[in-house]
């Protein structure tokens, strides 16, 4: 199984509602027509998340959303890319966006909190309030799931293990957990490209940036 990530910036400040409608109601559902995609979810770096983050860098600072797809294996990547081309050709793509970081990453670690009934491999499919993500150095996933608000964690790495992405799935209060996890990952955060919480994207609730968006 591979994780395909996209850290996405919406380049038009007035375009967040349109972007969310496109992604949640058109683009994301279409991905599940591809055999070998078992999971797809997107989270938002809301203003409240930005205020709670532990680290950022020039490359990742512009992003607003993180999407994660789980692919059966690398053979799923060609049809995944081909679908993107077909949607572009059919004018079913959102132009005012750019990926500041994207691509496939190998799964190198999985953890589940002892209190949850599911296996570590099932954690992403379990409902959560959001995630806490560390991009850059590897962090010990066990230290994350030891926190009572974390159901589990998955860790991904690029092919040369130069960049790790650790995703902790938070089923407790997100920002309380984020405060505690920021202390847990403090040493790694000094070298991290980005570290912080991301909120769950709920259907038809896309107003996080409304007060920041010109009308």
Predicted regions and their residues:
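Macromolecular interaction modules
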Residues: 1-215
């Amino acid at each position: 199984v591979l994780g395909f990530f996209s850290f996405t910036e919406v380049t038009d400040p007035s375009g967040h509602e349109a972007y969310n409608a496109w992604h949640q109601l058109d683009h994301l559902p279409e991905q599940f027509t591809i055999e070998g995609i078992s999971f797809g979810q997107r989270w938002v770096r809301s203003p409240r998340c930005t205020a709670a983050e532990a680290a950022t860098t020039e490359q990742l600072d512009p992003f607003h959303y993180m999407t994660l797809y789980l692919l059966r294996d690398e053979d799923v990547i060609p049809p995944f890319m081909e679908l993107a081309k077909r949607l572009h050709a059919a004018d079913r793509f959102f132009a005012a966006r750019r990926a500041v970081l994207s691509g496939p990453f190998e799964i190198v670690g999985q953890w589940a909190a002892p209190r949850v009934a599911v296996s570590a491999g099932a954690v992403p499919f379990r409902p959560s309030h959001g995630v806490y993500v560390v991009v850059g150095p590897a962090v010990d996933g066990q230290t994350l799931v030891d926190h009572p608000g974390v159901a589990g964690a998955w860790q991904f790495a690029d092919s040369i293990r130069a960049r790790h992405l650790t995703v902790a799935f938070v089923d407790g209060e997100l920002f309380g957990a984020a405060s505690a996890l920021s202390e847990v990952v403090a040493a790694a955060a000094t070298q991290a490209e980005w570290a912080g919480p991301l909120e769950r994207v709920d259907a038809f609730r896309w107003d996080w940036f409304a007060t920041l968006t010109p009308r």
